[in-house]
């Protein structure tokens, strides 16, 4: 039976392909939009059975052309929180997802999809309940609205439906995302290019570099997806973060100290990084002030109740491994 991955050439989709391959799974149909031809690089080292454009795929999938399908991992979306074209966002993220959900329910195919912590907006409670969901941008709204569609469908669903609300994911194969790549990625590139890291200054009551996010390694994200593949009786919407909020300063330090370790140099603390000029700040961008999440931290209670017991990589472990991967890939 085939496994289908949409967004397969993207960041999380391509890492999911790698995780499936490591299990010996190769009967995989990869689905994406390769208008940006450079993204083929995320597919080049994956073993797959076929590739389809996302527009060609959806009609064939709805007709049942692929025979028995073990699961559909729907990772494809426009992930830019800065995208202002609401019509494009809703068609690509909401309407396309609705069509896949409807077809999956009709075919009885387990449907595991990417939601986002962006649904929570500027709130301080990150629990999978409607009263805590107040998105700040149209990207967050597109994910929020699809989650509501799923909630209405779940009571009648006869096959698995799982939504995973990704928090701040970082790791290999995200370079194509440009401005939307992770803080860790941008810190590493700044350090290599400019010899220093520059973070946003104070905003929303948080000091310079002190904004807090739940940073989660993409390896952990892939593992949680596979957990639900292995437990098709589990359905619902679940947070997927590390369960810990860490500051941008801590990410920058993890990058700086990883690079220093590769040069056999001792680690620095924050004050030393600032004093040496390896870390600095710039004024917080005016354009982001009204739509910026200053703090996120996943409540993992429902995920743990769904049977996922593994520990998540610490920020230092995950960022350290990522920096070594970036160095090898340069």
From Swiss-Prot:
| Keyword check for Membrane | no
Provide the alphabetized UniProt keywords: Carbohydrate metabolism, Isomerase, NADP
Per the Swiss-Prot or TrEMBL record, the active site comprises 139, 177
Residue sites binding NADP(+) per the record: 11-12, 32-33, 39, 54, 75-79, 92, 143, 169, 177
According to UniProt, this protein's pathway is: Nucleotide-sugar biosynthesis; ADP-L-glycero-beta-D-manno-heptose biosynthesis; ADP-L-glycero-beta-D-manno-heptose from D-glycero-beta-D-manno-heptose 7-phosphate: step 4/4
Query: Where along the chain is substrate bound?
Result: 168, 179, 186, 200-203, 213, 292
Q: What's noted on cofactor binding?
A: Binds 1 NADP(+) per subunit.
Which Enzyme Commission number(s) are on file for it? 5.1.3.20
Query: Which Pfam families did the record assign?
Result: Epimerase
- Catalytic activity annotation: ADP-D-glycero-beta-D-manno-heptose = ADP-L-glycero-beta-D-manno-heptose
Cofactor(s) listed: NADP(+)
Q: Which GO terms describe its molecular function?
A: ADP-glyceromanno-heptose 6-epimerase activity; NADP binding
Output the GO biological process annotations, alphabetical, semicolon-separated. ADP-L-glycero-beta-D-manno-heptose biosynthetic process; carbohydrate metabolic process
**Origin: domain of life:** Bacteria
User: Is NADP one of the keywords UniProt gives this record?
Assistant: yes
Q: What does this protein do?
A: Catalyzes the interconversion between ADP-D-glycero-beta-D-manno-heptose and ADP-L-glycero-beta-D-manno-heptose via an epimerization at carbon 6 of the heptose.
Domain remark from Swiss-Prot or TrEMBL: Contains a large N-terminal NADP-binding domain, and a smaller C-terminal substrate-binding domain.
Q: How does it assemble?
A: Homopentamer.
Give the record's family classification: Belongs to the NAD(P)-dependent epimerase/dehydratase family. HldD subfamily.
Output this protein's name: ADP-L-glycero-D-manno-heptose-6-epimerase
- Gene from which this protein is expressed: hldD
């Amino acid at each position: 039976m085939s496994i289908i991955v949409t967004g397969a050439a993207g960041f999380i989709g391509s890492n999911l392909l790698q995780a499936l391959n490591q299990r010996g799974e190769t009967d995989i149909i990869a689905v994406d939009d390769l208008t940006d031809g450079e993204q083929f690089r995320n597919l080049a080292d994956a073993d797959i059975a076929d590739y389809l454009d996302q527009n060609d795929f959806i009609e064939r999938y709805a007709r049942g052309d692929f025979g028995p399908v073990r699961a559909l991992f729907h990772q494809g979306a426009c992930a830019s929180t800065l995208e202002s074209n609401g019509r494009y966002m809703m068609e690509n993220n909401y309407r396309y997802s609705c069509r896949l959900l409807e077809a999956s329910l009709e075919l009885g195919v387990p449907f595991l999809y990417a939601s986002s912590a962006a649904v929570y907006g500027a709130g301080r409670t990150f629990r999978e309940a409607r009263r805590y969901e107040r998105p700040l941008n149209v990207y967050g709204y597109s994910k929020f609205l699809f989650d509501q569609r799923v909630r209405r469908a779940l009571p009648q669903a006869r096959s698995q439906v799982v939504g995973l609300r990704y928090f701040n994911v970082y790791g290999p194969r995200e370079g194509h995302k440009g401005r939307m790549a992770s803080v860790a990625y941008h810190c590493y590139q700044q350090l290599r290019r400019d010899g220093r890291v520059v973070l946003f200054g104070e905003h929303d009551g948080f000091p310079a570099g002190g904004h807090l996010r739940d940073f989660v390694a993409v390896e952990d994200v892939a593992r949680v997806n596979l957990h639900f593949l292995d437990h098709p009786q589990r359905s619902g919407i679940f947070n997927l973060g590390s369960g810990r909020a860490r500051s941008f300063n801590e990410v920058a330090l993890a990058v700086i100290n990883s690079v220093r370790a590769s040069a056999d140099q001792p680690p620095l603390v924050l004050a030393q990084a600032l004093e040496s000029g390896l870390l600095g700040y710039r004024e917080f961008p005016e354009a982001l002030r009204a739509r910026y999440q200053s703090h996120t931290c996943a409540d993992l209670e429902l995920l743990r109740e769904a049977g996922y017991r593994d520990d998540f990589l610490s920020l230092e472990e995950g960022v350290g491994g990522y920096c070594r991967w970036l160095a090898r890939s340069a």
